[in-house]
Amino acid sequence: MWLPLVLLLAVLLLAVLCKVYLGLFSGSSPNPFSEDVKRPPAPLVTDKEARKKVLKQAFSANQVPEKLDVVVIGSGFGGLAAAAILAKAGKRVLVLEQHTKAGGCCHTFGKNGLEFDTGIHYIGRMEEGSIGRFILDQITEGQLDWAPLSSPFDIMVLEGPNGRKEYPMYSGEKAYIQGLKEKFPQEEAIIDKYIKLVKVVSSGAPHAILLKFLPLPVVQLLDRCGLLTRFSPFLQASTQSLAEVLQQLGASSELQAVLSYIFPTYGVTPNHSAFSMHALLVNHYMKGGFYPRGGSSEIAFHTIPVIQRAGGAVLTKATVQSVLLDSAGKACGVSVKKGHELVNIYCPIVVSNAGLFNTYEHLLPGNARCLPGVKQQLGTVRPGLGMTSVFICLRGTKEDLHLPSTNYYVYYDTDMDQAMERYVSMPREEAAEHIPLLFFAFPSAKDPTWEDRFPGRSTMIMLIPTAYEWFEEWQAELKGKRGSDYETFKNSFVEASMSVVLKLFPQLEGKVESVTAGSPLTNQFYLAAPRGACYGADHDLGRLHPCVMASLRAQSPIPNLYLTGQDIFTCGLVGALQGALLCSSAILKRNLYSDLKNLDSRIRAQKKKN
């Protein structure tokens, strides 16, 4: 009885998918990935004026190119990558950035003669031959050079009543697994099951991409029938918490903590994070970490020329006040604040890389914010974790100070959820004394070009989770004029964290030249991150639910307004890149994933011939 019904449903679904595919990818736009554009990396450009011409072109009305095809709001990598892909397809694109320098979380800034990154601490899967490296090479013409971190690439430090324990995460699958088993010899079978599950789940990530192409009613029907989670391990794991899966595997509390150590890279504790998100990140880094040679500003520096060569531009100091809508409610341009005046820029397509909250709550006119589709999307997500970043100038080279390229994650409790919940619910005056976790690293030790550019000196960065509410009373104050109470409170986190680092690296005593800290308010100012949430919308179980994932797509409820970046897929450079591919596919009406696969196959076939 059921077999004919199932077969009928399968035939109908196949027919729908065929119709959807033809409708989505029926465009006649040129293929942006028609040929291999990779070339050997050019020498690192260190001339400040040359870099300024690319990264710091200030907005003025006469700098706006004529006959624009697309305007992109925000120059984070999700915006730049989408603009570059569209430029490769012949589109003239203008990217507008509110900050003084392009790049978003990829931009760098100078402090006391040294350079600091703002968001790129390490990237996985950037070895030659990986799909992520291949896509970036095609966007930047192979000009990004990636330096591998040493092994172990991460060390989890657990400070407990019985002393300190360290758990190294070694590069390469075999070494990674062996390192875990050496620390937990009684739980080898559990570790094997965990790794197998990570690989199975992460291999299904394309299913999340497929969801964003299917019509929402089809996704909802498949979800109600239980078919999404039945046939996709990734989507099944999107409904299970990390803590739930580790408990089902039978891991001890200490092993659960160690396997969960990387959660700060997506900002959600084990009870509230989806195992699918965790599996993606673990698999992403299992072969090791990489860092852009020359620093993270290289990413924007080598993406912007692709946009410019197609007649486009990337302009800074360009705060977009609103998305312009025509009488039919379609996006038709943007309004940019220039001094006390507004400059209207008209174009057929607007792309927002400003995130869901900025786009829907601040950039849309009031009547558009009330649209059911807009309200529905905002109702399914919330801002993520806030961070305080600490930037430290050190006297001495990495050899002098014995600085590794390894990242450190320091914890004080195996129950990470309880520790974080207790911490964020504390009165702010007590919080600095109970920091539950700390990330720190030495960016200067990761970059092979550092010593040539900044001889005799080094840098360190620390990241501390902090509640936005603790800083909220100063949100209306101007940057740099928030008063002594703000500085004292912010510095309480710095002092507490520095004491931890100096215990692990006592050789740094007396080598600190300067310390600068940025609170969630700093992220809000420089990155336009609502509530200082550097990862955008929270990556919790709610956001990773298959139906919510499907609804967070490039096509917005406003015709001709598209979304790109980390809110469309996941956080991180590669997540933002996926958002850009989804956005560009929707605009060009091309399956860019298929285009990339075809190009990769042709390149591999050519290499075999040679």
Swiss-Prot record:
Cofactor(s), names only, from the UniProt record: NAD(+); NADP(+); FAD
GO terms for MF: all-trans-retinol 13,14-reductase activity
Keyword rRNA-binding: no
GO terms for cellular component: endoplasmic reticulum membrane; membrane; nuclear membrane; nuclear outer membrane
InterPro entries reported in the protein's UniProt record: FAD/NAD-bd_sf, Retinol_saturase
Listed EC numbers: 1.3.99.23
Membrane topology category: Peripheral membrane protein
Locations listed in the record: Endoplasmic reticulum membrane
UniProt xrefs under SUPFAM superfamilies: FAD/NAD(P)-binding domain (SSF51905)
Leader peptide range in chain numbering: 1-18
Any GO BP: retinol metabolic process
Tissue: Expressed in liver; expression positively correlates with obesity and liver steatosis. Expressed in adipose tissue; expression tends to be decreased in obese versus lean individuals.
Reactions the enzyme catalyzes: all-trans-13,14-dihydroretinol + A = all-trans-retinol + AH2
Keywords: Endoplasmic reticulum, FAD, Flavoprotein, Lipid metabolism, Membrane, NAD, NADP, Oxidoreductase, Signal
Superkingdom to which the source organism belongs: Eukaryota
The family this protein is said to belong to: Belongs to the carotenoid/retinoid oxidoreductase family. CrtISO subfamily.
Function: Catalyzes the saturation of all-trans-retinol to all-trans-13,14-dihydroretinol. Does not exhibit any activity toward all-trans-retinoic acid, nor 9-cis, 11-cis or 13-cis-retinol isomers. May play a role in the metabolism of vitamin A. Independently of retinol conversion, may regulate liver metabolism upstream of MLXIPL/ChREBP. May play a role in adipocyte differentiation.
Protein name per its UniProtKB record: All-trans-retinol 13,14-reductase
Taxonomic lineage from the root: Eukaryota, Metazoa, Chordata, Craniata, Vertebrata
